[in-house]
Amino acid sequence: MEFQHFQPAKILTPYIRHYYLFESSESVGYEDTVFPSGDMEIIFNLGNGIWESYQRGHYEKNPAIELWGQVTRPLQIRSVGVHLMLGVRFFPHATSFLLDDEIGIFNDQVSDLSDIMGRNIRDLHIQLAENSSITARIALLDTFFTDRLARAPKKVQRLHKVARILSSITQGSSENSIGRIADTHGITTRHLHKLVYQHTGLSPKSFDKIHRFKTSLKLISENKLPLTSIAYDAGYFDQSHFIRDFKSFTGLTPSAYLNNLSTVNQMLIN
């Protein structure tokens, strides 16, 4: 397996965390579990491999153009074949500039983006498949998303406000400080909840919870600190709080995860 990151055009950096290319050269079966990250993704399947995700009580074949909603619980995936996948990973709030639907309806699902965005995204997929150069593919993505951004000035203005709110939430906030954060940004607590949910598909509390988990996952994967220190550095009240949250997102205790690191989550952790 080969996994590479690429940065988007500068104008897109407040919205797109990175592009990535995933390639596998062997036609072998593969299974893993995806954990919550707080981010949403678009994935263009450019190879012949088949991916399936466990949704609605059974495995379903993923579409050619995947929209990954917020993952709020462990999501099982499996694949077979030779893969070439080009992904777009957005910051937690940023997919909303592309979509007219409420973001929360996509939670814990892999949706067919061509059904949502229509011909424009299908044409982009065709162009990406026709170009074998990664430089050309990145240029196509940059052009497409820059154009979509230019069409949504009002959405972009709200995105900047939501980005500032999310930054406040992740900077050492607790459940009890949401009211103070709302005051800081000159809005009511109710409006803060509405803005965060509309743009991320998550409540402020859930967003903060996933952020802490993601921090702990990265620290565990680095394997440089004891679990007690990781719990503290990630912002948990105590060790039991850390273990409870970690298990709800992975199905494993932190120590069990450390002994069985997930390939997909290792690749996507940054």
What are these regions (language model features)?
Residues 156-160, 168-169, 196-220, 245, ...:
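Alpha-helical DNA-contacting segments of helix-turn-helix folds
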Residues 222, 226-229, 243:
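Phosphate-/nucleic-acid-contacting segments
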